[in-house]
Amino acid sequence: MTAAEIDIRQILKLLPHRYPMLLVDRVLEFEPQKRIKTLKNVTINEPFFQGHFPGQPVMPGVMILEALAQSAGLLTFGADMERKEGALYYFVGIDGARFKQVVYPGDQLHMNVTVERYIRGIWKFKAFATVDEKVACEAELMCTVKQADA
């Protein structure tokens, strides 16, 4: 499957997130089980801008990390192009998170995620987000897939 085939309808099938927590608008590049590049159009309409910060809206760093994690989820689930019913993608660790540039409304946030390894049910990713080709955030992410509690 190519990046062009992963449109918003496919993203909604692969990720359980919905507004206001869906933070991936588009897949730009995709190599199954290797890497993914995604896009988030950051708008003033995001609910977190109401309080972060009034008069000086800045995208919270944890939301950038969440956008990277959702991109990692697409990379994992995207290999099969389906998410099993009830499967959820959980963070199990974040290492080396660094925030290097502020993200404002109107910015296009590009998320780049690469698989580092998969061992005993834990995925490890190298991830970074850019705005205008400048790194805004970088981190190593560790995630696992679990069935939701019934």
From Swiss-Prot:
A GO biological-process term: fatty acid biosynthetic process
Keywords noted in UniProt: Cytoplasm, Lipid A biosynthesis, Lipid biosynthesis, Lipid metabolism, Lyase
GO cellular component, one term: membrane
Gene3D superfamilies: Hotdog Thioesterase
Root EC class: lyase
Residues annotated as the enzyme's active site: H52
GO function terms (MF aspect): (3R)-hydroxyacyl-[acyl-carrier-protein] dehydratase activity
EC numbers on record: 4.2.1.59
CDD domains according to UniProt: FabZ
Alphabetized InterPro entries for the sequence: FabA_FabZ, FabZ, HotDog_dom_sf
Subcellular location: Cytoplasm
Reactions it catalyzes: a (3R)-hydroxyacyl-[ACP] = a (2E)-enoyl-[ACP] + H2O
Functional summary from the UniProt entry: Involved in unsaturated fatty acids biosynthesis. Catalyzes the dehydration of short chain beta-hydroxyacyl-ACPs and long chain saturated and unsaturated beta-hydroxyacyl-ACPs.
Family classification: Belongs to the thioester dehydratase family. FabZ subfamily.
Name by which UniProt lists this protein: 3-hydroxyacyl-[acyl-carrier-protein] dehydratase FabZ
Organism placement in taxonomy: Bacteria, Pseudomonadati, Pseudomonadota, Betaproteobacteria, Burkholderiales
